Regions:
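Extracellular calcium-associated, cysteine-rich motifs in secreted modular proteins
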Residues: 206-298, 304-306
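Substrate-binding/catalytic groove segments of enzymes
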Residues: 35-41, 49, 58-71, 101-123, ...
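Short, intrinsically disordered C-terminal tails of secreted or membrane-associated proteins
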Residues: 310-312
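Extracellular/surface-exposed low-complexity segments
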Residues: 90, 99, 104, 109-216, ...
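Glycine-rich beta-solenoid repeat tracts in large extracellular/virion proteins
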Residues: 8-22, 39-46, 63-87, 106-112
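Right-handed parallel beta-helix
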Residues: 1-17, 22-37, 49-61, 94-102
Length: 316
């Protein structure tokens, strides 16, 4: 998820530093973009192959100030030859299933923006805005088929939006910044402005928002051998809580994953499973088996169906 950024939704480097367009492959799937602009949106991609599939674009108050960005998926341009590519190299793009959201009040008040969003939702290629004139026009950059990549679980764009807001991020628990940003994306709003002239949700310093949060630690669970795995988990899963070496040993039935990897995975396995559920195309996901999986004790915050509510589920 990218939110509240003036540009780069995203900026794709292409093969300009390698000169090998055949080696540049990007799979952009199931991302959420909110409130980009007004400097720019997604652009560049000088050489390479790109899939833009089932992404969810939600233009916000900052996007609304530049109409040309409201319905942009990407603006490809040719390489200028100043690095490793030959001058004139374009990327190739496959776009399908991407959805633009028109519910932000700043967007709904602009008839042109509403019309353009309808246009790109009808035909995603209306969201590819060429920056320059390739030899054969849009055909130069257009691929009729997706480029082959590794198999992953995919949702449609609308479901991806809900999944990202509910489950995305590398945090075991979301902090107040994560919660604020996902809430703003859901409601099409913003909370802060910059201290140096930026407006509409764009900031100029971390001091303009919550700053750097001081995180508090909790007492750690008993770990007699100091291997990073609590005694209770080791005992429940056939390990020796007084043997420091078993944490780095392969865990039974885990395809080579070590015991400590299986333990760490167990902390967020329920989040991962919920995030991957209801996929329209699913790859085989491997979750290492445990003899006695722990009962989650954390607070999981997820979206309720009503757009302005949070549903907080406590597990014990």
């Amino acid at each position: 998820m990218l939110a509240h950024h003036t540009s780069r939704t995203p900026r794709l480097c292409g093969s300009r530093y390698t000169g090998r367009p055949d080696d540049e492959r990007v799979d952009l799937i199931n991302n959420v973009f909110y409130n980009w602009g007004p400097t720019n949106g997604g652009y560049a991609g000088e050489g390479g192959s790109y899939n833009f599939i089932n992404n969810y674009y939600k233009p916000g108050p900052s996007t609304a100030t530049k109409t040309s960005l409201v319905h942009r998926i990407f603006a490809p341009n040719a390489d200028d030859g100043s690095n490793s590519n030959e001058a004139g190299v374009w990327g190739k793009f496959y776009v399908a299933g991407n959805v633009f959201d028109n519910t932000c009040p700043d967007i709904q008040s602009n008839a042109t923006s509403m019309k353009n969003i309808e246009s790109v939702n009808t035909n995603n290629w209306n969201g590819i805005h060429l920056n320059g004139t390739p030899p054969n026009g849009l055909l130069t950059v257009k691929s009729p088929d997706p480029f082959p990549t590794v198999d992953i679980s995919q949702h449609n764009a609308e479901m991806a939006y809900e999944k990202v807001l509910a489950y995305a991020g590398a945090s075991y628990m979301r902090d107040i910044i994560d919660i604020r940003i996902t809430d703003e994306a859901w409601n099409g709003t913003y909370t802060y402005e910059g201290s140096n002239g930026s407006t509409n949700g764009i900031i100029d310093s971390q001091a303009d928002v919550e700053g750097y949060i001081e995180y508090k630690s909790a007492p750690r669970l008993r770990d007699s051998d100091g291997d990073g795995i609590p005694d209770a988990w080791e005992t429940a899963n056939g390990l020796d809580p007084y043997d420091i070496s078993d944490a780095a040993e392969p865990f039974a039935g885990a395809n080579g994953y070590t015991a400590i990897e299986v333990y760490i995975n167990s902390l967020v396995e329920d989040i991962m499973r919920d995030g991957l559920a209801d996929a329209e195309s699913a790859s085989t996901e491997f979750f290492p088996p445990m003899y006695n999986p722990p009962t989650p004790t954390k607070t999981i915050i997820s979206r309720a169906k009503a757009p302005t509510l949070w549903k907080i589920t406590m597990y014990s």
